[in-house]
């Protein structure tokens, strides 16, 4: 499964793991929709929490693909919610 290969790549000690922790708080405090959305938004480029909390979020292109824009790693965001907010994308429409 692609899930396992994704986990392998993010298991590397990147700064994204640190930023994903901060993004978890940011995502949950948003309270806009689900934790999965917040985790994915802030997870940045393959953040561990972005994948772990996002659960099925990676199906939409990884943690930064769903609600990109709010990513702690400085990603501009290339997802349906590139403004950093939940705007009715696949991650936010739930």
Curated annotation (Swiss-Prot):
Q: By its UniProt entry, which InterPro entries does this protein fall under?
A: HssA/B-like_chaperone, HssA/B-related
Can you tell me where the transmembrane regions are?
none
Region (Disordered): which ranges?
Answer: 1-20
Q: Name one Pfam family in it.
A: Coiled
Q: Which GO terms describe its biological process?
A: sorocarp development
Write out the similarity annotation: Belongs to the hssA/B family.
Question: Which PANTHER family does the record associate with it?
Answer: HSSA/B-LIKE PROTEIN 1-RELATED-RELATED, HSSA_B-LIKE PROTEIN 1-RELATED
Please state what the protein is called: HssA/B-like protein 49
Species whose genome carries this gene: Dictyostelium discoideum
Species lineage? Eukaryota, Amoebozoa, Evosea, Eumycetozoa, Dictyostelia
Identify the coding gene: hssl49
